[in-house]
Amino acid sequence: MCVDCVEKEYPNRGNICLESGSFLLNFTGCAVCNKRDFMLITNKSLKEEDGEEIVTYDHLCKNCHHVIARHEYTFSIMDEFQEYTMLCLLCGKAEDTISILPDDPRQMTLLF
């Protein structure tokens, strides 16, 4: 992973969890070949462990194949919620939780 290729290391992305793709706005250019171009996604893998899906892949410079960052995305179901996380030097860090029920219990108002 190369901190010289990104504007900000692990930017906070709130609840935007990417299973694929690249956050190009954070890419300043390849520190090896000095070009700012699209990236390749390589070594993509999907593993399932204990009900959790883990997607990992590498962001590579399209021109010189320099490894810019390693991307990790996870998905799991906990009780009545889907939980997503993302951790990547380039794309950032993020978490999101979404209810699988028609009405989100966190959004219910108390009727007293």
UniProtKB/Swiss-Prot annotation:
Keyword Transcription listed: yes
GO biological process terms held by the UniProt record: fibroblast growth factor receptor signaling pathway; positive regulation of DNA-templated transcription
Covalent S-S links between cysteines: none
Residues annotated for Zn(2+) 1 binding in this entry: 2, 5, 30, 66
Domain of life, per lineage: Eukaryota
Family according to the record: Belongs to the Churchill family.
Protein name: Protein Churchill
